[in-house]
């Protein structure tokens, strides 16, 4: 079966984990890994796995996009450089999945709104953040039943799972995730908080989700909606688990989740990596299905 050929931009934790997710896909093939440090472990591992590599950033990939038929690129670099990366790749007809908090394209959470993005050709979609992918489905599960005045999420992440790129983008991480709780989750106001936990041994990713509904919670319908949504996420993130809840207190609804990874690149405590890379892979697969079926066509680049 024909596969859509992909490039991975960024050779850090997220980019390296993506290699394994995409290699398992029936629809996607990883072909290029792009970095900026010739000595990076991610580039070395990519070469071992048979990918072509460059340490010259996106500019090192551009001359090879057409000859290697790259149609989808995953950008796992930084919010600060994403817009320029995306502009250069889009100009060559490459669809970009954005794993930075840049959020220049529409925000995507697979079980909430992926199908609508795939149905129309978006050349850049943003995966928000690991915390967003872990918590927005639950907020949406509440807001589709009852209006939510306020949603607050707290993500606790093992320090060892947070690379320099994510650390440099923590402000953008908070801002983008807070906004996505509103735009995608459906809350009128959203607030996202991240705790980077240096404990040894490293702790699994944990998420606390609190919603304040306008009316008294319809506990039976809300619980059913939340459990259904947890099942949807588990289809592509098997380690996504409801630990406690939903708990009800007045108009408050609280849910406690944890996310274990598959252990592809970092150990299983790094569920924050897995939920981000799995969501991005699922998103790319949906676009790949549409491309392979001829339902959407990527633009043909103009040859100078």
Curated annotation (Swiss-Prot):
Domain of life from the UniProt record: Bacteria
GO molecular function: acetaldehyde dehydrogenase (acetylating) activity; NAD binding
Catalytic activity: acetaldehyde + NAD(+) + CoA = acetyl-CoA + NADH + H(+)
Keywords: Aromatic hydrocarbons catabolism, NAD, Oxidoreductase
Gene Ontology terms: biological process: catabolic process
Enzyme kind, highest EC tier: oxidoreductase
SUPFAM superfamilies noted in UniProt: Glyceraldehyde-3-phosphate dehydrogenase-like, C-terminal domain (SSF55347), NAD(P)-binding Rossmann-fold domains (SSF51735)
EC number: 1.2.1.10
Keyword Oxidoreductase attached: yes
Family assignment from sequence similarity: Belongs to the acetaldehyde dehydrogenase family.
Listed HAMAP family: Ac_ald_DH_ac (MF_01657)
Official protein name in the record: Acetaldehyde dehydrogenase 3
Organismal lineage: Bacteria, Pseudomonadati, Pseudomonadota, Gammaproteobacteria, Pseudomonadales
């Amino acid at each position: 079966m024909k596969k859509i050929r992909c490039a991975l931009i960024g050779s850090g934790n997220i980019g390296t984990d993506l290699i394994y997710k995409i290699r398992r896909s029936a629809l996607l093939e990883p072909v290029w890994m792009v970095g900026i440090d010739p000595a990076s472990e991610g580039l070395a591992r990519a070469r071992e796995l048979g990918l072509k590599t460059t340490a010259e950033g996106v500019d090192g990939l551009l001359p090879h996009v057409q000859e290697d038929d790259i149609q989808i690129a995953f950008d796992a670099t930084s919010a600060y450089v994403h817009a320029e990366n995306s502009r250069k790749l889009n100009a060559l007809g490459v669809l970009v999945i954005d794993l930075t908090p840049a959020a220049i394209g529409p925000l995507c959470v697979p079980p909430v709104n992926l199908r609508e993005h795939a149905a129309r050709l978006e050349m850049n979609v943003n995966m928000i953040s690991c915390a967003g992918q872990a918590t927005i489905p639950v907020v949406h599960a509440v807001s589709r039943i009852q209006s939510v005045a306020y949603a607050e999420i707290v993500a606790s992440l093992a320090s060892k799972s947070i690379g320099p790129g994510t650390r440099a983008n923590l402000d953008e991480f908070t801002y983008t995730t807070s906004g996505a709780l509103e735009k995608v989750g459906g809350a009128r106001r959203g607030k996202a908080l991240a705790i980077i936990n240096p404990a040894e041994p490293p702790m699994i990713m944990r998420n606390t989700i609190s919603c304040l509904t306008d009316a008294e919670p319809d506990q039976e319908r809300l619980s059913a909606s939340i459990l259904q949504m947890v099942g949807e996420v588990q289809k592509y993130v098997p380690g996504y688990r409801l630990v406690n809840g939903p708990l009800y207190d007045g108009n408050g609804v609280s849910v406690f989740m944890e996310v274990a990874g598959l252990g592809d690149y970092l150990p299983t405590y790094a569920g924050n990596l897995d939920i981000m890379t799995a969501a991005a892979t699922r998103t790319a697969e949906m676009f790949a299905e549409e491309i392979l079926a001829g339902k959407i066509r990527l633009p043909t680049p103009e040859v100078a």
